[in-house]
Every structure is written in C-alpha cells, then in structure tokens.
UniProtKB/Swiss-Prot annotation:
Protein name per Swiss-Prot or TrEMBL: Fructose-1,6-bisphosphatase class 3
Segment forming the signal sequence: none
One Pfam family linked to the record: FBPase_2
GO molecular function: fructose 1,6-bisphosphate 1-phosphatase activity
Keywords on record: Carbohydrate metabolism, Hydrolase, Manganese
This protein's encoding gene: fbp
Amino acid sequence: MVYSNNDVIQDFGSDLRYLKLLSKEFPTIASASTEIINLQAILNLPKGTEHFLSDIHGEYESFNHVLKNGSGNIKRKIIEVFGDLLSETEIKSLATLIYYPEQKLDLIHKKEENIEEWYKVTISRLVEVCRKAAFKYTRMKVRKALPKDFAYIIEELMHRGPKELDKEEYYNEIIETIIRIGRADEFIIEMSKLIQRLVIDRLHIVGDIFDRGPGPDIVMDTLLNYHSVDIQWGNHDVLWMGSAAGSEACIATLIRICATYSNLNTIEDGYGINLLPLATFALDFYKDDDCTAFKPKIKSDIIYTENDLKLIAKMHKAISIIQFKLEGEIINRRPHFSMEDRLLLNKINYEDGTVDIDGKIYKLKDSNFPTINPKNPYKLTIEEKELMEKLKSSFLNSEKLQRHVRFLFSNGSMYLKFNSNLMYHGGIPMNEDGSFKKVTIDSSGISYSGKAYFDRLEILVREAYFRKNNPIAKQHGMDITWYLWTGPDSPLFGKDKMTTFERYFINDKETHVEKKDPYFKLEDNEKMCRIIFEEFGLNPDVSHIINGHVPVKLKEGESPIRANGKLLVIDGGFSRTYQGTTGIAGYTLIYNSYGLLLVSHDPFESTQKAIEEEKDIHSTTMVLEKEVERKRVRDTDDGEKLKFQVKDLEMLLDAYRSGLIKEQR
C-alpha cells in the first residue's frame, strides 16, 4: 500500500513475521524510505535493451560480431552522438575500434603518426558514446559494470557536465595522464568492452548454439562470460546435453553429425575428447570399404588430404551404424514413443541388399554391414560396446563440456516468458484443427499437451543429467533427451520423423520427406497465437512469440513476421549452409524502450576483414512496433518485482510508525 493515512494501523497478520525479517535489512524509517525512493526512481527509467539471437550453429565468428555490434546498436549510438560531426569513415573506424579494440589498436600503432593526438580524440569520443549507452541505467548499475582498474576515472569522465568549464582542466588532465603513463591502450580496451556491455541489458539465445559450425565451444565460452543471458534449448543443444549426461545414442548421433560436416575438431580440440578408439575401430571393420555414401561434406576454407577424408568416411559409417542400433534399443525400450517406423535394420534383406519400408522394397546404395547380425540387428558387438564405453567415459570426463552443459541447465529452459514475449526454439505439437496435441511420453499412460508438456519435458531433461542416484529415472530422462532430438512429437524437432537412414542408403527422395507438425502450417494464424498466449498465461493483445529453428526463405517470398506480427521467426541464419537457400544471413531482434526492431543481416565475411577493412555486417533494420509512450522499467517483469518490493517496504514503514516493529538505531 502507499502510506497515506496516519490514522490507520494495518492488520498485518501473517505479514508481520516477514516484515520483522525485512527490518534486519532496513532497520530504520530512514533506510526503508531511502530504498523506496531509489526503487521508485528505477521504475521510471527507460527499460533496458534486449537482444534476441537464434540458431548460431557453432558459427562463432558471425555470432561474436553480431554480439559485439549489438545488431547495429553500437553504430546507432555513435550516429546519435556524432551523426553531424563525424564522416561515415570516422564512424566506421570508431565502431570497429569498439567491436575489436585489441586488434584494431595493433593496426593503429602501425599507421598512426601522431598517436598521442589520436588517443586524446578517441578517448573523448569513447567517453561520449559510453555516456549515451549508460544514460538509461542508475549510477549504481553502471558502477557495477565498470572495470576495476579504471572505475573511478571512467565514472568521473562519464559524469562530466556540459557547463563544467571550471573543471575542464581537471578532465583534460585525467586523459593526458592516462596517455603519459602508457595506459591509453588498456583504457580504450576497457571502455570499448564497457560500451558493448551497456548497449545490451539482456541477451536471449533462442536455441541451437551447437551443430555443424566450427566453434560452439567458443560461443559457449563467450556466453559464460556474458553479463546477462538466458537460453531456450534447441534440438542440437539437447543432443549435446544428453551426451554430457551419458546417453550413448546422443553421443553416437553427435559424432555422426560432426563427421558429416568434417567437424570432428570440435569434439577433439574443442572439448578434448579422444576419438582415436573410433578411428581404430573404423579402420579394423571398414578397411576395405570406401564408404562412398559417408564421405564428409568439406568446408571450402579447410584443406584435407585424401587419407583424412577416407578415414573420416569410415568413422562416419561406423558411428552411424552404432547410432541406428542404439536408437533401436530406445525405441524397443519405450514403445510409448511410437517410433516403430524408425526400426529399419530389421527390415533389411541382407542377402539381396534391399530394405522394406511401408511395404515397398528399395535397393540399398550400400549393403556392407560387417557389424550387424541379421538375426539380431540391434545388438551391439563386443567391440562396439567397448568403443561406446570409452567414448562415453570421455564425454563424462570432459571438464569443459560438463562446465558448458551445466551452464545450459542453469541459464536455460524449454521456454521463457519475459516482458510479454514467449520464446521457444521449435514449435508446440498440434492437431490439424489447431488444438494442442496430447502426447504420452512414459509408461504411465498420462498425456500432456501445451504448456504442461513443455514443463514435463524440462523436468525429465534435468533428471537425465542430475538424477545420478536413481538409474531408472536417469535412463528415462536420457531417452527423453534423445526423443527431443528426433521424436515425432518433439517441440524442438517439429517433424513426424527424421529420415537419417533413408538419406544415407536410399536414392528415392520420396523416402527422405519429413512432414512438419501442423504448428508450422498454422503459425501465420493469429488465432493460434492467441490460444498459445492464453495457454502460457500471457496477454494476447500485447504479447509476441519469438521462434527459432526454421530458416526464413526470403528468396521464396517468406517473411519472418507471421500472424499480424504476433509471431516472429528469427532463425539467425548464421549457418553458411542455409544462406544460399535463405538469401540472407538471417534475423535478429532488438527490443528497446521505443519498441521492437527486426534486423536482417547480410552474410558476414570474416573477422579479419571486419578489423582490417572495417567491413561491418550490412544490416537492415525494420521497426515492427513503436511504443506510443516509451516503455519504462515499471512496464517490465523486473518492474513488477520492484513494485512488490516497494509495497513491502511501505508496509514496513507502517509497522515502524504504528509501533508494531521497533527501529534498530
């Protein structure tokens, strides 16, 4: 309540005990009043800027650049401050310095003749940009973000008033001293990093950090050190999470994907996992097999020897067969997954090299299966069992992988509601009529749908990793984690089946078809979005769904804006594989106090060109929604929490003034 009536003493009831605890933190009327004033002031600040990225797929260079430039947000700040004062070339140079301060300084030192003058001008400009980036935060919040070595100096320079002529010499002397004692480079680096931090208040990653790109581990290291981030798990993410938990099916699938895209370095160098046992196994059992159907896809910027490619192909085939066997074990163990159509090893005629799929006979492209027993095709050989034990041990004992996956659990979830936005990676299983599909995922026969399905899946995924003292619950959780990768009613996958076997072994492309969930047909339907908002407890009139997973094919006329702006598809398009299909490098989203901005990006060339030639990603910004009144902290989820704190403190004031609680002076 707002304290306004001195004649009324509240009936505090059960709140009194809580207020006594609160009084330990605010022991006097003065301290409680000061906190109320502070919180009330914060509620009236502009809301912080949120940055949404999705589907990074291990492409760390593109990801790092978009993160550093805030989807163009830093350049916008520079233009707001210096738009009429600096040339386009000067703006580009200043932006590049802020993105890559260490590397850019190296180049500056080689070509700048009057480095001291350059330092003076550059430091002054950085201070102005930093002031602009920090204006919407309290001094306390900015102070917490300041680098320790320069905290006092930066704070002094940032709060320099435009009319403080008497202190002009004071501020100039600070900058000149920084230069004179040889700390200018360090100061510029820290200022640049501070600007990067201040332009984005919260980062949302809407799934798929992992996949075929060369550096998911580098992306994860970056996120671990980011000041405020949440993650909505994608299908590729749960595959790595399941592998870190010890799911052999996830491990085999993960290795197969890395082999497909000649990206085994991520496993070996990125996470220190030894793949020599797999190489040895593959050479033993497939030494006379050229494994044509399993030749890896080669990246244009990496050179492989012929022997390298032959070995990867053999490893690729070996782990693929093991994957099919392990998947068969899960499908037979969990009949409620309803995935019997994926049991194909027992449908092969090993004598004539054909397979029966849905009553139709297909010739196999490859019929050499030295490790399959036709009478018991899903049984691992002794050597395969030993191999998987070694690989599992390596995954379980990779300190870096375990650290990254723990971060995915602590900062991630199946979905997130935040400031009237609902974020999830794929879709919500639906029936053709737009109703939520009921799905049975365990032997209890209990069905789940909509939000309850997401909540139940998240519990089970967490059990896969954390229920080490309960082998049955852990195994069920690991099987569910694998199901989220490939299952017909997985919200993260969104298709009726994954036709991995058919793509390897059958030429007929009709067998490769994967039918999308009805959700994806209905995602342009505003009524469906409103039903989803109500299911998740959000106001349909002001909320948005923010989706990843499916690349937007701009070339074919697709739009990322669906259902009259209620659903936004922001597949980042970082994966180079999709850029030929989409026509761009995908979308990111900015949500600031003025509204929603959708940013489309052209492909990123390289970090080297970004630094040396100052080639930023060319981005086009579209204003989706503009607020009539600027959004304040009071209009956000954090604002609601602060309002409750204010209410509690006002109750504490009443308790002090009514004598129910004594001040501790």
